Design a protein with these regions (language model features):
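Polybasic/polar functional segments that serve as interface/processing modules
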Residues: 1-287
């Protein structure tokens, strides 16, 4: 980051990172699609998502004030974490904050805490003026043999904490076939002499904060509006290892032509999601 800026008072800049990933899977029948949705829903339930967000909080050097989480019927999950840049004395923390202490995430709690927390149907994590949230969206259609799973993660911070440093961890935490990342900086802070600062770090692309070995696996496109401190990066996986996209099916059970057809359909689905447009519409089929 280079030399640190000398600021007057608190750093009032708000830095928001929106991270969206898509996992694509081939499931031929409606039954297989439902089984896939059930499987992925269990794999990325609120417990696992909470652990991921707590790790994100740790990586940005923040402290958890409160955690809330919820699994939904028939599928999907949400977790919200409120965080603080600095550890706060217990007397300053609102009594409604659970500090992330609930039985399935933090086993080192006393019996009184466990009794209180066991009565809660949901748990949320919050930061002081900053927060981390995650939501999941499984999806399929009976007329299409491809099911998708979307994860939306938002990290909003104030002060010196930067959410960009957790990108590699987030990408590796999910089966990320398509990734959309948005980063924006809002507000202003001041230098000691009163000069307004609308940005406190150097950036010309979100790619600056993603490891080269990660970028090498994707086709990457940037759309940035520097004057507005808006940065946008889209990533599309380059190689498709078909076995990794088949649900309850071995690739060697399929004839070569079928493998090519499925791979083609997967690629078309990914391109449409990446482009945000119905390029191929429903003119292709893998049934």
């Amino acid at each position: 980051m280079g030399d640190k800026l000398k600021l007057y008072g608190f750093n009032n800049l708000t830095k928001t990172l929106s991270f969206n990933i898509y996992d694509v899977c081939y499931a031929k029948s409606e039954r297989e699609q439902k089984d896939y949705i059930a499987y992925i829903d269990e794999q990325y339930n609120s417990e696992r998502l909470t652990r991921i967000l707590c790790k994100v909080t740790e990586m940005v050097g923040a402290h958890v004030l409160n955690i809330s989480k919820q699994d939904y019927d028939p599928q999907g999950a949400s977790v919200t974490v409120l965080i603080t840049e600095r550890a706060l004395p217990a007397k300053l923390i609102d009594k409604s904050c659970n500090l992330g202490k609930y039985s399935n995430v933090n086993e080192n709690i006393n019996s009184k805490e466990a009794e209180i927390l066991s009565t809660r149907d949901s748990v949320v994590a919050h930061l002081d003026k900053s927060h981390v949230t995650v939501h999941t969206y499984p999806e399929y259609h009976p007329d299409n043999s491809i099911a998708t799973f979307r994860v939306d993660i938002d990290v909003s911070t104030c002060g010196q904490i930067s959410p960009l440093n957790v990108l590699d961890y987030l990408i590796s935490s999910f089966d990320s076939d398509i990734i959309t990342i948005d980063y924006r900086v809002r507000g202003f802070t001041r230098s000691v002499d009163g000069h307004k600062l609308f940005m406190d770090h150097k950036i010309n692309s979100i790619q600056n904060y993603i490891a080269k070995e990660t970028l090498d696996k994707y086709d990457v496109v940037d759309i940035n509006v520097y004057q507005a401190n808006i940065f946008h990066t889209k990533m599309l996986i380059k190689e498709i290892d078909l076995q990794n996209y088949l649900f309850n099916t071995d690739v060697y059970e399929l004839p070569p032509k079928k493998r090519l057809d499925i791979t083609d359909s997967l690629r078309k689905e990914m391109i449409e999601i990446f482009s945000g447009a119905n390029i191929y519409w429903c003119k292709y089929s893998t049934s």
